[in-house]
From Swiss-Prot:
GO terms for molecular function: ATP binding; kinase activity; phosphotransferase activity, alcohol group as acceptor. It comes from the Bacteria. Keywords: ATP-binding, Carbohydrate metabolism, Kinase, Nucleotide-binding, Transferase. It holds the Pfam family AnmK. NCBIfam families: PRK09585.1-5. It comes from Rhodospirillum rubrum (strain ATCC 11170 / ATH 1.1.1 / DSM 467 / LMG 4362 / NCIMB 8255 / S1). This is Anhydro-N-acetylmuramic acid kinase. Its EC number is 2.7.1.170.
Length: 375
């Protein structure tokens, strides 16, 4: 079945590897691109530290790194995504019509109309024998939009029946929020600021571990007011929404002189304060915040958000959503929408000039040889 020539509900696989570089999330979803009819199983496979180091070395595509290095990483990551998707499909017994493949972001500079996600859609389609939609950000970026965030379309579909105004906050490496209002208002979305990236970088530098489990180190420290003020002085917070960030937009320099605990506490406060400031760009204050992404597992962040926002702040599991699978589910949903020419972004979510569809469609019989680097 060619998904582009049908309009019924189908099973789709979503594959996501985010800016936190934790690993690959895969999820199954049955949808027609408008509604979610059934949520299937999900799977997460962590990257080993060597893979994270390879990705980290190429973030921002630094000078001195060859095209061959990027292409090799793209191929290897695509093969890993194929293995994870094949496992999920095999375990579920479901035959998907399409796979939504985000790829790994190395660079995001929408002001230069540039966003780089590596991954070979043709190779993935060949390995799985399933059609693939990738390059989901490119049409928006080329049209002058931010290319991010992309998940608001999925949040909007899930939020049917929930009290509004509602904010859905994703705390991955970068924080992003979707504001959902009453009636038929289009969603408003943008990156709020740091998510877990700075805290993870701090823990790696100071303690040699990947994260601050449950915010234990942050809870042991004190917030440094001067360092927090310096962090919040970044130009990004003065820009109107819609807006988006590269993972490495912020620096650890303001906290470098602090103790391990005080630095962690200050970085948690930075994430929470940037979310609180995001309300300035919303049409109305949210009655409730639902949090997904790895940040919802950090108790120090969740406590700081509750103090700073003054309304209910809950993990998305409180309304029956799967916070670990949500972004992968979103890319399954977006793959169906993109294949059928439905909007993925709006002026209120990315600053695009009009509602835009997107994605490159690779039929299951695609021949190998297409470029593995999407620009």
């Amino acid at each position: 079945m060619d998904l582009r020539e049908s309009d019924g509900a189908v099973w789709a696989v979503g594959l996501m590897s985010g800016t936190s570089m934790d690993g690959i999330d895969a999820a199954l979803l049955r949808t027609d691109g408008h509604q979610v009819f059934e949520v299937g199983p999900a799977l997460t496979v962590a990257y080993d530290e060597a893979t994270r180091a390879r990705i980290r070395a190429l973030l921002g595509t630094p000078p001195g790194r060859s095209v061959a290095e990027v292409a090799d990483l793209a191929r290897d990551l695509t093969e890993r995504h194929a293995e994870v998707a094949a496992r999920l499909i095999g375990q579920s017994g479901v035959t998907p019509a399409v796979v939504g493949f985000h790829g790994q972001t190395l660079l995001h500079r929408p002001e230069a109309r540039l966003s780089v996600q590596i991954g070979d859609g043709a190779l993935l389609a060949r390995r799985l024998g399933v059609a693939v939609v990738n390059d989901l950000r490119q049409a928006d970026v080329r049209a002058g939009g931010q290319g991010a965030p992309l998940v608001p379309a999925y949040h909007l579909a899930l939020a049917k029946g929930l009290a509004r105004p509602l904010a859905v906050l994703n705390l991955g490496g970068v924080g992003n929020v979707t504001w959902i209002g009453e009636g038929d208002q289009p969603p408003v979305a943008f990156d709020t600021g740091p998510g877990n990236a700075l805290i993870d970088d701090w823990m790696r530098r100071r303690r040699g571990v990947a994260m601050d489990a449950d915010g234990a180190l942050a809870r042991s420290g004190r917030i440094d007011g001067a360092a927090l003020e310096a962090l919040l002085g970044h130009d990004y917070f003065r820009k109107p929404a819609p807006k988006s960030l590269d993972r490495d937009a912020f620096s650890l320099e303001p906290v470098n002189g602090l103790s391990d605990g005080d630095g962690a506490a200050t970085l948690v406060a930075f994430t929470a304060a940037s979310v609180a400031r995001a309300r300035d760009w919303m049409p109305a204050p949210p009655k409730r915040w639902l949090v997904c992404g790895g940040g919802r597992r950090n108790g120090a962040i969740m406590e700081a958000l509750t103090r700073g926002l003054g309304v209910a702040v809950d993990p998305v599991e409180a309304v029956g959503w799967d916070g670990d699978a949500l972004e992968a589910q979103a890319f399954a949903f977006l793959a169906v929408r993109g294949a059928r020419g439905l909007p993925l972004t709006w002026p209120t979510t990315t600053g695009a000039p009009r509602p835009l569809t997107g994605g490159t469609y690779w039929p299951a019989a695609t021949v190998l040889g297409a470029s593995a680097v999407a620009r």
